[in-house]
């Protein structure tokens, strides 16, 4: 039986998981405010991978809530590719959307290194931090360069773990995850295969306040939300009259609303017309995002947004296989860039995500006094955007143009 590598991608509350290792050379200082052509190129490739993965989820879990962190999954797989060689490595990066002829491996590695550095760059009023942990079996001998890279270049915590005691290993990993996620995720790993010799755990912590927080006194406790033609549920509905960037895409039959966080992040709510969700999902791409970015116009909106929490857990193994990552799971897997030990292969890739949308922002907390801007007298002249049926949600970081989180809310009452 081959020894297994277990990849855990953890996302919570707007929190998630990411892992990455380094390319040759030293990390250069990153300046998140400085334009970077490589980052923008990568953001387009990463966005297209995100939408391809999203469409896989719609097939596997039709009519269900979807929520995951694309940047987490991409960065974790790139990290894995650093330890992979030959066709194992090629399949991973090509599944992510990279063409090694156009974008050499070293450029991909440096690009993700700078991406992670930029995302971790301190920003006032925005908590965004990527962390990594590597649990290595006591008998595994990782290559010194690989170990040095993940420790020094990506500040990865490395633990020596006794995987011969499966119960104790699970407890060690789950305790670390629970501590790092401030108790949001408990008992993440329920099952480890007996031959597991390495576990990679990656997370993003994200917390931000709306630039225009909602007044809780205006939240309606029970409002109808349409799940399908015959089913509605009752949800709390937040309300405000405010200026937002928005548009109606006549080609895709959807309304797009941009809600800014107080610093360097934004949420895009995509509300298709009834019966048009599938056509909108099929059209989502990096080009679509660029088009919307050009066309969004700021104006007064009478806005109704549900207050909700959702979560999603995925076993990515079968999904990644269908998308093209096959050698990594096979007996022919080549992880000789990670260890000289033979026979290492990928066992599983687990991903968990949790989201809360409330009056203040992405997490429930004491709500400060709400400052109201001057509102127009003739409110009936302004568009009403009522998010009262299934919608897509994207959360992006501005400086890197990265999709931190992507999802679809079908039923906001299903936590």
From Swiss-Prot:
GO terms for biological process: thyroid hormone transport. Pfam families: Serpin. Keywords: Glycoprotein, Secreted, Signal. It comes from the Eukaryota. One of its GO terms (molecular function) is serine-type endopeptidase inhibitor activity. Glycans are attached at residues 36, 99, 165, 253. CDD domains: serpinA7_TBG. Thyroxine binds at residues 293, 398. Its main location: secreted. One of its GO terms (cellular component) is extracellular space. Residues 1-20 form the signal peptide. It is found in: Secreted. PANTHER family: SERINE PROTEASE INHIBITOR, SERPIN, THYROXINE-BINDING GLOBULIN. Major thyroid hormone transport protein in serum. Belongs to the serpin family. This is Thyroxine-binding globulin. It comes from Pan troglodytes. The gene is SERPINA7.
